[in-house]
Amino acid sequence: MHTNSPLRADNQDLETQPLLRPNTEESQLLNDEVRINVANETLIKSRWRSIKCLIIYLLGIVLLSFFGVSIVQYIRGHVPPTDVIEKNLVQVTNFKLVEFQLDGWKDNMGSDLNNDTGKYLQVSIHSQIWFDYDKWPGTENDSDARSQRDWIRYINEKVLKTICIDLNNVTTFDGDLVFKNKLGDVVGMEPICFNLAHRQINNLQFKILVKPSIWKIVKVLKKFWNRDFESLNIKSNLDMTIFKRKFGTRFNLLKLNDEILDWKDIIDWEKISATPLRMIQNMIDGISLQGFTLRDSSSDGFHADMRLNPITILGGVDWLHLPPGTSIPFINWEIKLPDCNGEPAIAIPTLSCFNEPINLHHDKDNIVVCLQNEIEGPLPDELLYQECPQNSLTPMSQIVNAVLNQNETVTFAARGHVLEDGIDNNSLIPADMLEDIFQEASFIPITTNATFNSSELIQEFQINDLQLRWAARKKLSLVGTFLGFFDLSFYETHQQDRVRIDTIRGQIDLYHNDINFLNLPMKQWINSSSHILHDEDTGNTQMKLQFDLENDDMEVVNSLELTRTLNEILFQGFTVIHFNATIDASLTTALGPWVLTGLAGEGDTLVT
């Protein structure tokens, strides 16, 4: 048998097979061990990574906490409280009003202008605003204040840079925030945006709508006029949104709703109102008559046309602009005249006083006011016949004499009523609203100085046929005729009985060689006569007054000069003397009686 037969080969394989199997298992075990070791190493590395991440995370939390605490401490040390921020921002904010244009009245935000019945006043405002952070209070010697300022400036200039404000609504009250104290609402028609950089001037032009509560505003204006600043308690309820535009997107930063602003915290009412009140007072004080015409009326009274000197409305307020063609409509003025104490308490129901429409120029200068007056008699008894204890005159006599004395003032009260004439006068204030103003304001006292000087009223005094002689019982007697001529060129009349002088009293002082030697007292009322004349050259009205001098109760002031005067009369037949006359005249008019006092005049005359 051959040794290399197939059978032998198979036997050899079978013999060798057990010997080969243990080597394969050992290799497999080695591979498994390697894999286990690799897995363990990977697990260990993963665990170390997790531990490292955990440590880093915990360390990050600690660092962030420390950093957060540091930031909080920094903010606490550098960022002032909210109330300090608000107060100090007012100090660094600068505002200048360039133009305040009253556009007119509207029914609502979307409507056109309607000056007849509009409820909202549209106002166009041009103003400038800028921030001067150097004005932050206390930075000169307080490091905390400087840190606070630097923080606010950094946030404003580097972070915010610009902001915008939507003025949704601002409701203002005087007193508690209830309806009865409401002054009005202000609504913004467009956002207002400005730059927060240091001393960067922002030119702002925007429109607002104002819906006033007239009756309450008038009450507040009265407080200003009466300088009653202590009772002012003006607050505003703010509804506004502060936002920023970035990348074409709007980001709301702060929404203020029901935020209360107390205006006395930022405004000194007495200081800010001083200039406007002074301007208004100067305007009233400057009112004077430019022309005055009096004529008889068909109702047995008088009609008076009064033209005031052109006045300036709020002169010097260059920033205020009125709508072109604006006017004040026909207004009927209800008048009360002063009583004995000078208080305007006597109503005059028979007086009708109204102004013609007043055109308000754009420059507010040279505004012409014309008043038409219709008055019938008789006037109230308390005006004509009540005797005032301080001077035994009636209130009417006191008024007339004050008018004729350029050094005296007269206080009267007036309340207006709008007269609807059916013509579109483009009124500055809608008629119904203006009527509400007048009714709420009621009677407004006005003190004025009427520039109607009595010296201009007296044209000439004369004494004719004056004789000086010794009478019975060695009493000095003076007789003659006194004539007075009064300039009534303002009075258009052809009647003789509408105005007349019935009696006079007073005193005449006589001078010789500039020495007062004799006085003629007329303590009792003396009958007189008067006549209406018309100047032949001008046609102007005059009044001639005449009364007889016949008095034995002379007062000798200088006996020596009296002797010289009588000697001249004795040897020359006459002498020239100078006289000063001061008389009171009792008038009877279609309106009732009154007394003119202190009518003074002088002249020269011959004495025989």
Curated annotation (Swiss-Prot):
The chain crosses the membrane at residues 55-75. It is found in: Membrane. The modification Phosphoserine is found at residue 27. It holds the Pfam family Tag1_C. It comes from the Eukaryota. This is Putative uncharacterized protein YLR173W. The keyword Transmembrane applies. Glycans are attached at residues 115, 141, 169, 407, 425, 449, 453, 527, 580. The keyword Transmembrane applies. It is a single-pass membrane protein. GO terms for cellular component: fungal-type vacuole membrane; membrane. GO terms for biological process: cellular response to nitrogen starvation; negative regulation of macroautophagy; protein localization to phagophore assembly site. The modification Phosphothreonine is found at residue 24. Residues 1-21 are annotated as: Disordered. Keywords: Glycoprotein, Membrane, Phosphoprotein, Transmembrane, Transmembrane helix. The lineage of its organism: Eukaryota, Fungi, Dikarya, Ascomycota, Saccharomycotina.
